[in-house]
UniProtKB/Swiss-Prot annotation:
Domain of life: Bacteria
Disruption phenotype: Deletion reduces transcription of mgtA during late exponential phase of liquid culture.
GO cellular component: cytosol
Identification of the protein by name: Transcriptional regulator Rob
GO biological process: regulation of DNA-templated transcription
Keyword Nucleotide-binding: no
Species the sequence originates in: Salmonella typhimurium (strain LT2 / SGSC1412 / ATCC 700720)
Organism phylogeny: Bacteria, Pseudomonadati, Pseudomonadota, Gammaproteobacteria, Enterobacterales
Further details from the record: Overexpression of Rob confers resistance to cyclohexane.
Gene: rob
C-alpha cells in the first residue's frame, strides 16, 4: 500500500479512537512504523503534525459534547484524554478563543475553531447557498427520543425511517415534498444524553388524505444556509454529519437558535416497502451572518 493509503486508513482509525489513549508510540505501533517515520510520513501526506491534529480533533469532539450534552466539563476533559480540567480549559481556549463554560452557555453556536477530519482521496465538499425563508405553516407530528452522543448518528437514521413510516402509514402514495424539522438539546434527566425533537410534516395544502392526527406546525422564517443531497435516503445522515463537521467550519458560520430543516423531494411516488428510495434533500441550518 502506498503512503497515502496507509495514512488514509490511519485517519479513519484515529477518528474512531479519539477517546482512547493515543500516544505516538501507540499510533506508530498500530501503523507498523517507528514513531519518527510515522510522524514524517503523516506530515508529508497531510501537511499536518500528527500530535497537533489529534489534539485539535479531540477538542472539536469535546466542543460538540459541550453543546449537545450536560456532561460536567471535567468528565468531557477526561474522556478526551486531558489530564485535568485546567489543562483542557487552556487548550480549549487556545483553539476556540473562549472557555469551555462560555462556549456551552452561548445562545448561538459558532463553527469557529472546529477542526474538520482530514480526508484523503475522492471527496467533494457539498455546495451551499444562502436563502431567506418566510414563515411557512405546515401540518405535522412531533416525536422525541433521547440518546447518548455516541449513539446519535445511528439513532437519527433509525428514527427517521420509523417516524416517516408512522407518519405516512395511511397514505396511498408518497407526497411530492416532505419536511423534517429537527431540534436537539441536552437531556434534562441524564447529563450524558441529549433529547431530540423531530417533526414530520407536510405543507397544509398537501396534508389532506395523507396523514392523521397532525397538528399545525410553523416553519420559522429567517436566514439559512442550504446544502443539497441527492441519492438514497440511507445516505442522508452521513451527509448531515459532513455538513456540520466539515462545511460549517470551512464557511466559519454561526448557527442561531432554531430548527434544522430537512426538505425532501422523493424521486418515486410509490411506496417501496423496506427498500430505501431515491430522493433529493435540501438541508437548511438557521444562521446569523
Amino acid at each position: 500500500m502506498d503512503q497515502a493509503g496507509i495514512i488514509r486508513d490511519l485517519l479513519i482509525w484515529l477518528e474512531g479512537h479519539l477517546d482512547q489513549p493515543l500516544s505516538l508510540d501507540n499510533v506508530a505501533a498500530k501503523a507498523g512504523y517507528s514513531k519518527w517515520h510515522l510522524q514524517r510520513m503523516f506530515k508529508d501526506v497531510t501537511g499536518h503534525a500528527i500530535g497537533a491534529y489529534i489534539r485539535a480533533r479531540r477538542l472539536s469532539k469535546s466542543a460538540v459534547a459541550l453543546r449537545l450534552t450536560a456532561r460536567p466539563i471535567l468528565d468531557i476533559a477526561l474522556q478526551y484524554r486531558f489530564d485535568s480540567q485546567q489543562t483542557f480549559t487552556r487548550a480549549f481556549k487556545k483553539q476556540f478563543s473562549q472557555t469551555p463554560a462560555l462556549y456551552r452557555r452561548s445562545s448561538e453556536w459558532s463553527a469557529f475553531g472546529i477542526r474538520p477530519p482530514l480526508r484523503l482521496g475522492e471527496f467533494t465538499v457539498p455546495e451551499h447557498q444562502f436563502v431567506t425563508l418566510e414563515d411557512t405553516p405546515l401540518l405535522g407530528v412531533t416525536q422525541s427520543y433521547s440518546c447518548s452522543l455516541e449513539q446519535i448518528s445511528d439513532f437519527r437514521h433509525e428514527m427517521r425511517v420509523q417516524f416517516w413510516h408512522d407518519f405516512l402509514g395511511h397514505s396511498p402514495t408518497i407526497p411530492p415534498v416532505l419536511y423534517g424539522l429537527n431540534e436537539t438539546r441536552p437531556s434534562m434527566e441524564k447529563d450524558d444524553e441529549q433529547e431530540v425533537f423531530y417533526t414530520t410534516a407536510l405543507p397544509q395544502e398537501q396534508a389532506d388524505g395523507y396523514v392523521q392526527s397532525a397538528h399545525p406546525v410553523l416553519l420559522q422564517g429567517g436566514e439559512y444556509v442550504m446544502f443539497t443531497y441527492e441519492g438514497l435516503g440511507t445516505g442522508v445522515q452521513d451527509f448531515i454529519l459532513t455538513v456540520y463537521g466539515t462545511c460549517m467550519p470551512m464557511l466559519n458560520l454561526t448557527r442561531r437558535k432554531g430548527q434544522d430543516i430537512e426538505r425532501y423531494y422523493p424521486s418515486e411516488d410509490t411506496k417501496t416497502g423496506d427498500r430505501p428510495i431515491n430522493l433529493r434533500c435540501e438541508f437548511l441550518i438557521p444562521i446569523r451572518r
